[in-house]
């Protein structure tokens, strides 16, 4: 081989390696499948936990007034018949929501009986949850409006729940993506399943990735050390939850690269009950593509019950 030609070939190889960057490590398919199956097991375990989404049986939005709570049908907030006819009153005041317990009725906070307690909301440093027999309730605050969320730790829906339906595991939906940061992280308005209510998380930038030879982009928000994606795709019409799905990704390295794994995408809590306030996919986060990976939707795994304004 001509010496000059050999040097030219070597130079081209070096330039190609530098231009392409480090090669992606080959995916161990068996280990990857085991990872996804472990993730699915953890997902179901969290759903079935006492304070998971499946024990939620009621959501009641509150104005500044007094509400009676109990199993008596005449109560402002009616709970299952396993509870006392009149548990007490929720008094919504400028300083918060006070629970005043009916005399002779046992309500516990951290295992200790209480007769009156200020119900600090879930947005506070020390939120309060109280229990009565199999029931528990707490106050949630969503950018101003407040509600009482009720759980039943003996809810029969939990016993009959499952299994969660999934698409087959497909490594093609585990993609390398890139975060293109905004000049400054920005607050974005995100609609929720509650009409008129929005959330206002922080978005660091736009994530771009490629699927089936086409480039797409999503706007994630910051969730602790991770990026949180609320996305929609063409499967929302028939096989996945209509309002979209969730997926998390580890924050990118200094090069802005991250792994976005749609095999770990899952249905939001509102796919399982009517008592959640989850965000829905924004128009910019709806992808014109069928992402046939991750969790699917099954109508029989949704509990409606009652939710009152």
Mark where each language-model region is.
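Bacterial signal peptide processing site
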Residues: 21-23
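Forkhead-associated
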Residues: 56, 61-127
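C-terminal motif of bacterial Sec signal peptides marking the signal peptidase cleavage site
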Residues: 16-19
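Surface-exposed beta-loop interaction hotspot
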Residues: 131-199
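Bacterial N-terminal signal peptides that target proteins for export
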Residues: 1-9
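Flexible, glycine-rich surface segments
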Residues: 176-236, 241
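An exposed acidic His-Trp-rich patch
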Residues: 111-126, 215-264
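Extended, aromatic/histidine-rich regions of cofactor-dependent oxidoreductases associated
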Residues: 163-166, 234-238, 251, 257-259, ...
């Amino acid at each position: 081989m001509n010496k000059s030609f050999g040097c030219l070939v070597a130079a081209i190889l070096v330039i190609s390696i530098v231009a392409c960057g480090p090669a992606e490590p080959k995916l161990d398919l068996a280990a990857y499948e085991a990872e996804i199956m472990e993730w699915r097991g953890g997902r179901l375990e969290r759903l079935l936990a006492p304070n998971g989404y499946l024990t939620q049986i009621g959501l009641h939005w509150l104005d500044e007034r007094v509400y009676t709570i109990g199993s008596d049908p005449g109560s402002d907030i009616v709970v299952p018949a396993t509870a006392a006819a009149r548990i007490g009153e929720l008094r919504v005041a400028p300083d918060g929501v006070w629970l005043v317990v009916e005399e002779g009725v046992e309500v516990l906070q951290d295992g200790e009986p209480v007769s009156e307690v200020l119900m600090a909301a879930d947005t506070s440093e020390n939120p309060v949850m109280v229990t009565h027999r199999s029931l528990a309730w707490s106050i949630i605050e969503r950018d101003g409006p407040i509600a009482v969320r009720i759980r039943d730790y003996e809810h029969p829906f939990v016993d009959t729940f499952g299994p969660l339906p999934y698409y087959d595991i497909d490594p093609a939906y585990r993609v390398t993506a890139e975060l293109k940061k905004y000049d400054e992280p920005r607050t974005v308005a995100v609609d929720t399943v509650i009409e008129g209510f929005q959330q206002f998380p922080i978005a660091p930038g736009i994530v771009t990735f490629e699927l089936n030879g086409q480039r797409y982009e999503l706007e994630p928000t910051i969730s602790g050390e991770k990026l949180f994606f609320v996305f929609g795709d063409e499967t929302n019409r028939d096989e996945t939850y209509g309002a979209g799905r969730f997926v998390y990704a580890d924050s990118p390295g200094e090069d802005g690269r991250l792994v976005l794994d749609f095999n770990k995408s899952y249905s939001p809590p509102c796919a399982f009950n009517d008592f959640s306030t989850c965000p829905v996919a924004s128009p910019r986060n709806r992808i014109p593509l069928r992402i046939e990976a991750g969790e699917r939707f099954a109508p029989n795994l949704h509990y409606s019950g009652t939710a009152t304004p």
